[in-house]
A protein has these predicted regions:
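N-terminal positively charged helical leader segments and presequences
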Residues: 1-63, 161
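RNA substrate-binding interface of SAM-dependent RNA methyltransferases
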Residues: 8, 15-18, 40-41, 74-75, ...
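Structural motif
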Residues: 24-29, 71, 92-93
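Short, acidic/turn-prone active-site loops that include or flank metal/cofactor-
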Residues: 27-29, 51-53, 75, 120-122, ...
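Short, glycine/polar-rich helix-capping loops at beta-to-alpha or helix-loop-helix junctions
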Residues: 31-35, 122-129, 191-197
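Glycine-rich phosphate-binding loops that contact phosphosugars or nucleotide phosphates
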Residues: 68
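Active-site/ligand-binding-proximal alpha/beta "capping" segment
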Residues: 163-210
C-alpha cells in the first residue's frame, strides 16, 4: 500500500477505487466535503485525524490535511504492451519525483496508453509523484522496469517505433511520422538519453516556440 496526499490525487484514488482508507482533519473534511461524500459511495473508510497527526503524515511544509491509503497500482511493462498500445511514454532514469509526476500527467493529457519508467528510477507510486501527477497516476497504466534493454525489446516486438527526444534531433516534431504505434523515450533530468539515443528509430527535436 501507499499513502498519498492532496485533493487531486485523493479524489482520483477514491473515484477509481484505488483508495481503501481516507484520513482527514476537521478543516479538510469541510473543505473537501465532496471527496468525503464520495468515500461513502465507494466504500472507503474515512478516519478523522488531528492537525498534529496530519503534519506527521505529510511530507510538505503546509499539509492539506487530506490523505488516502491506496492499493498498489503499478503495472508491468509486459501487461501494458499486451494491450497493444498506440502511444507509450518511456521516461529513462528519472530521478526527481516532481518530474516523474509531471511526465505521468502529461502522458495522460496527450492520450498515451501507458507510461513505462525504464532503468533505475524514482518510485512512481511515491507520495510526491502522485501529488505531481495531479491524479493522473490513477487514470493511466504506469509501470517500472529496471532493464532498459528489455523494455526496448518489448516495444519493438510489439511493432512500435521508438522515438527519442533530443535537442539536436534530425527531425522536427512537426515532420515526424506519428501514424504508427509510437513509444517516446524521455531522458534523465541531468544527462538526457546519452548513448541510448542510438537505439531509437529516430531522434526528434521538440522546438520551444516563444
Amino acid at each position: 500500500t501507499v499513502i498519498i496526499e492532496g485533493e487531486n490525487a485523493v479524489d482520483a484514488a477514491v473515484s477509481t477505487g484505488a483508495a481503501t482508507d481516507v484520513f482527514v482533519t476537521e478543516k479538510a473534511a469541510e473543505r473537501f466535503a465532496h471527496i468525503v461524500t464520495a468515500c461513502g459511495y465507494m466504500d472507503v473508510y474515512v478516519h478523522p485525524i488531528t492537525d498534529k497527526a496530519a503534519k506527521h503524515l505529510s511530507d510538505t511544509a503546509t499539509s492539506t490535511g487530506l490523505f488516502a491509503v491506496c492499493r498498489p497500482v503499478l503495472w508491468t511493462a509486459g501487461k501494458i504492451m499486451a494491450g497493444k498500445p498506440k502511444l507509450v511514454s518511456v521516461p529513462v532514469l528519472t530521478s526527481e519525483p516532481g518530474n516523474a509526476g509531471t511526465l505521468i500527467r502529461t502522458s495522460d493529457a496527450m492520450g498515451a496508453d501507458g507510461v513505462i519508467f525504464a532503468g533505475e528510477t524514482v518510485d512512481p507510486l511515491g507520495c510526491k509523484v502522485a501529488r505531481a501527477s495531479a491524479g493522473s497516476l490513477f487514470h493511466i497504466p504506469v509501470a517500472r522496469d529496471p532493464n532498459i534493454k528489455d523494455v526496448l525489446g518489448k516495444l519493438r516486438s510489439s511493432g512500435m517505433q521508438v522515438l527519442a527526444t533530443a535537442a539536436d534531433g534530425e527531425v522536427d516534431l512537426a515532420d515526424a511520422d506519428l501514424s504508427q504505434p509510437t513509444a517516446w523515450l524521455f531522458g534523465n533530468e541531468a544527462h538526457g538519453l546519452g548513448d541510448l539515443q542510438d537505439e531509437a528509430d529516430m531522434r526528434v527535436r521538440i522546438p520551444i516556440l516563444g
